[in-house]
């Protein structure tokens, strides 16, 4: 990277070279190793802070991404299969959201409408709006090839999709991705990993 500085902005004081930079020049230096998120393709990786994310999709509505590693491990889904009641949802849209918002700006995290339709097609739980969520089972199917086939994950990880719902006398079973990348379901009291799913403003600058 090359920055042109007017000689008038360079001085020597006590044997030290002093360079006066304007805000644009300073910004160029600070962002020298960053790229605009919109330039990345599905499967590309980038960093927010010390966390690595994978680009899943670029669209007019934002850039959908997922954490490469588990942000949390051994997390219980909750007391039932309704994502709206899950302590993981509270965690992601509380402490975790605050951490990411400090790094990218709150206005650059785009709210998502989450479909809580069960694996067997029941809509008891409706929808909800989240700043940060988990993939649904259908979203996992959509992005499976991007995330990788025959993956070997260190643990199982949750989706937001219930296996069925109370109208079918099932209220405790939730879909998860197994360590072999196959979709299964288990009781909501089990402990699995958490991979945050976000929709970001494509114009933000990110590190590779």
Per-region residue spans from a language model:
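Collagenous Gly-X-Y triple-helix signature in extracellular proteins
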Residues: 2-208
